[in-house]
Amino acid sequence: MITLALSKGRIFEETMPLLAAAGIEVTEDPEKSRKLILATTRPDVRVVLVRASDVPTYVQYGGADLGVTGLDVLLENGNQGMYQPLDLRIAACRLSVAVRADYDYASAVKQGSRLRVATKYVGLAREFFASKGVHVDLIKLYGSMELAPLTGLADAIVDLVSTGNTLKANHLVEVERIMDISARLVVNQAALKLKREPIRRIIDAFASAIPTA
């Protein structure tokens, strides 16, 4: 049995064409089913649904043989014990700094002000601001980042941005682009040795179906 870890939402939806290229289709809609383990049209392949931030953990410790997760999750939480054969070029977005539209971020940085920054990417944010010599106090949040500048909790946020519509709707503007993000295929190293042929076939099928830029 080969177990693939996925999270619900955009990554799940955009992984489906890649699975189809490998001759694998999930037999139930995760949005309608309460099951966390989903069967597929291949009796030897199943999909487990976990939180996006937990995908690398399941793969690293052998709860899943393969997984699809964002580069942001891998960089923030570490990627030990995993093979990363493919950038799948799906779920593309960017990690950015955003502030209120009326906040002069450039002046604050130039003056050496100490900024309060809200984010769930504390490690990546710390590394980014340290590289620029900007002093920050980081506030860990798990969602609704846009509220932080609006309520005075923080001067800025570091979050994923796709279209920018959510920022615009909340009167925020993107002021720095930290990095581009996309989903990666990750594979448990022990599983790759023990189940080499079936896993290799899935990797090759994914590779052939990756969207072109």
Swiss-Prot record:
Coiled-coil segments, which residues? none
Q: Which CDD domains match?
A: PBP2_HisGs
UniProt-listed HAMAP family:
HisG_Short
User: Can you quote a single GO CC term?
Assistant: cytoplasm
Q: Which superkingdom? A: Bacteria
Q: Where in the cell is it found?
A: Cytoplasm
| Gene3D superfamilies xrefs | Periplasmic binding protein-like II
State what this protein does. Answer: Catalyzes the condensation of ATP and 5-phosphoribose 1-diphosphate to form N'-(5'-phosphoribosyl)-ATP (PR-ATP). Has a crucial role in the pathway because the rate of histidine biosynthesis seems to be controlled primarily by regulation of HisG enzymatic activity.
- So what does this thing catalyse? 1-(5-phospho-beta-D-ribosyl)-ATP + diphosphate = 5-phospho-alpha-D-ribose 1-diphosphate + ATP
Q: Does the keyword Cytoplasm apply?
A: yes
Q: Which family does it belong to?
A: Belongs to the ATP phosphoribosyltransferase family. Short subfamily.
Protein name (Swiss-Prot/TrEMBL): ATP phosphoribosyltransferase
Provide the domain comment. Answer: Lacks the C-terminal regulatory region which is replaced by HisZ.
Could you give a single Gene Ontology term from the biological process aspect?
A: L-histidine biosynthetic process
Organism, scientific name: Variovorax paradoxus (strain S110)
Q: What is the lineage of its organism?
A: Bacteria, Pseudomonadati, Pseudomonadota, Betaproteobacteria, Burkholderiales
Subunit structure comment from the entry: Heteromultimer composed of HisG and HisZ subunits.
Pfam families according to UniProt: HisG
Q: Which SUPFAM superfamilies match?
A: Periplasmic binding protein-like II (SSF53850)
Task: Kindly state which keywords UniProt assigns to this record, in alphabetical order.
Answer: Amino-acid biosynthesis, ATP-binding, Cytoplasm, Glycosyltransferase, Histidine biosynthesis, Nucleotide-binding, Transferase
Q: Which gene encodes it?
A: hisG
Which InterPro entries does the protein's record reference?
ATP_PRibTrfase_cat, ATP_PRibTrfase_CS, ATP_PRibTrfase_HisG, ATP_PRibTrfase_HisG_short
Q: Name one GO molecular function term.
A: ATP binding
**Pathway of this protein?**
Amino-acid biosynthesis; L-histidine biosynthesis; L-histidine from 5-phospho-alpha-D-ribose 1-diphosphate: step 1/9
Supply the EC number(s).
Answer: 2.4.2.17
NCBIfam families under this entry? hisG
